[in-house]
Amino acid sequence: MSSPKVGFVSLGCPKALVDSERILTQLRTEGYEVTPEYNDADVVVVNTCGFIDSAKAESLEAIGEAIAENGKVIVTGCMGVEESVIRQVHPSVLAVTGPQQYEEVVRAVHGVAPPRQDHNPYLDLVPPQGVKLTPRHYAYLKISEGCNHRCSFCIIPSMRGDLVSRPVGDVLSEAERLVRAGVKELLVISQDTSAYGVDIKYRSGFWNGRPVKTRMTELCAALSELGVWTRLHYVYPYPHVDEVIGLMADGKVLPYLDIPFQHASPRILRAMKRPAFEDKTLARIKRWREECPDLTLRSTFIVGFPGETEEDFQYLLDWMSEAQLDRVGCFQYSPVEGAPANTLDNPVPDEVKQERWERFMEHQQAISTARLSTRVGREIDVLIDSVDEEGAVGRSSADAPEIDGCVYVDSEQPLKAGDMVRVRVTDSDEYDLWGERIA
């Protein structure tokens, strides 16, 4: 008897990717095969994104494609909280579940394609690190779920609930398994990484027989013992974030902080229900760079938020000139169903949003170009992501996968994905570096 086969489509952010990995790990444990072909699958699972309208549209399109190609489709993920919308567009879906409802997804798969009764999990073991959808040399490490903030443009708490921190011992044990499996970079993710442990009052857990506090700084210190790159994402700028800068300066954690500032105008930040301390933030950035000169700062911003005036937008551009951030993403404000910001007065016209977005990107591009040019002539460590006939492509400590730039490496010796090499930088542009391998 052949094993049932599952097709899987994973959309959205790295946190959703980790959810997909968890579901697939359970299905593989039960003997299911995972297939990349729609027509070879007994059932297709689509893990959706529902954060903004464009993501919902992409999710609905992916569901429709899976139905057209296969016909047996189970929907899960963030858009699953809007089951009526999904069924209105695609009434033939077999089941709809929300985010984090892993067991419900597996039960739905059982209902369509039951697992083999003669499957012995002890003879067909899943790798200890579980099924991973990333390349072997890096992995996302989710440390918590949900968020306690109530930003006016966001509906994540209504989809994923309040903050729930994973036990620190479980997180560190998972990290150990990943490193043993060959992972060389751990990307720490959550909805709010710097709030890790606040829901359980930073209670201590145990790892390798010793207590470790459920707190970002202590977690990072423990992860540093594993001897691989540790990169921090989605870090809300609480005061205790200052503590990890010392770990970065000492080489224990990558000197990289992903902090979603969203805007700089105090008036817009208040409307967003975000901290409106942009002047203090500039002072902190200055202190961080004094303590850790190699620090890379990444952030995301929203332009065209309801009520944003030309004065607010110019304030943001001036702030960007002061902050000199290294890596920046920018989005035009898009209404999200259920978000409080939808009720705010003075929406910004689409053509103004587009014009401001273009000006913002041009402004930041000049900053990025100048900052990257200072790295020419320096020697940096590069983790190789891919190799083809044109050469090797990798990332430095300043580059997260898929969202930042990359380093194009010229090497006389053959390279492969996962290699860590020393590179002398020879050229740069707005986002990327070029260099020669020296070791």
From Swiss-Prot:
Record's GO cellular component terms: cytosol
Domain MTTase N-terminal stretches: 4-114
Binding site for [4Fe-4S] cluster 1: 13, 49, 78
Documented EC number(s): 2.8.4.4
Cofactor(s) needed: [4Fe-4S] cluster
Keyword Metal-binding: yes
Chain ranges of the Radical SAM core domain: 133-370
Domain TRAM: 373-439
One GO MF term attached to the UniProt entry: aspartic acid methylthiotransferase activity
Keyword Heme annotated: no
Enzyme class: transferase
Catalytic reaction equation(s): L-aspartate(89)-[ribosomal protein uS12]-hydrogen + (sulfur carrier)-SH + AH2 + 2 S-adenosyl-L-methionine = 3-methylsulfanyl-L-aspartate(89)-[ribosomal protein uS12]-hydrogen + (sulfur carrier)-H + 5'-deoxyadenosine + L-methionine + A + S-adenosyl-L-homocysteine + 2 H(+)
GO biological process, one term: tRNA modification
PROSITE patterns, A to Z: MTTASE_N, MTTASE_RADICAL, RADICAL_SAM, TRAM
Gene3D superfamilies assigned to the protein according to its UniProt record, in alphabetical order: Methylthiotransferase, N-terminal domain (3.40.50.12160), Nucleic acid-binding proteins (2.40.50.140), tm_1862 like domain (3.80.30.20)
One protein family per Pfam: TRAM_2
Amino acids binding [4Fe-4S] cluster 2: 147, 151, 154
Free-text remark on how the cofactor is bound: Binds 2 [4Fe-4S] clusters. One cluster is coordinated with 3 cysteines and an exchangeable S-adenosyl-L-methionine.
Record localization: Cytoplasm
Record keywords, A-Z: 4Fe-4S, Cytoplasm, Iron, Iron-sulfur, Metal-binding, S-adenosyl-L-methionine, Transferase
Homology family: Belongs to the methylthiotransferase family. RimO subfamily.
Function of the molecule: Catalyzes the methylthiolation of an aspartic acid residue of ribosomal protein uS12.
Name of the protein: Ribosomal protein uS12 methylthiotransferase RimO
Organism: Bordetella pertussis (strain Tohama I / ATCC BAA-589 / NCTC 13251)
Lineage: Bacteria, Pseudomonadati, Pseudomonadota, Betaproteobacteria, Burkholderiales
Gene assigned in the entry: rimO
